[in-house]
């Protein structure tokens, strides 16, 4: 089972990672100014993770596939790592779909 891990950046802003059961980070959030905003972002990932239409499949400037998960309002709520192949990207999306909805939250900022 996956988990969300809330962390702080050096500038004091909050972000979260969705970590799969094997310890691999499969989604990273944008930065948030407050912890409640980051928690709201986690709830948004949980709510949108199972909807394939919320995944924006992209390619980086160096040709590596990745994806963004978007909320209903179109805002990016999480970004994947860069993958070596489109199949790898699809596996990453499947992992978010299966891990996010029931994931616990671990707060490392306390």
Predicted segments, located by residue:
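Mixed-charge, glycine-accented linear interaction segment located at domain edges/termini
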Residues: 94-95, 101-104, 108
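Intrinsic disorder/low-complexity detector
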Residues: 1, 107-110
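A structural feature that tracks compact, well-ordered secondary-structure segments
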Residues: 3-9, 13-21, 26-32, 41-45, ...
């Amino acid at each position: 089972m996956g988990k969300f891990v809330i962390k702080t950046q050096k500038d004091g802003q909050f972000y979260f990672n969705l970590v799969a059961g094997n310890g691999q980070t499969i989604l990273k959030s944008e930065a948030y100014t407050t912890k409640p905003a980051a928690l709201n972002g986690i709830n948004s990932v949980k709510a949108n993770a199972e909807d394939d239409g919320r995944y924006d499949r992209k390619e980086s400037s160096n040709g590596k596939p990745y994806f963004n998960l978007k909320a209903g309002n179109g805002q990016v709520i999480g970004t994947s790592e860069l993958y070596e192949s489109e199949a790898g990207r699809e596996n990453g999306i499947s992992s978010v779909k299966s891990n996010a909805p029931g994931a616990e939250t671990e707060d490392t900022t306390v």
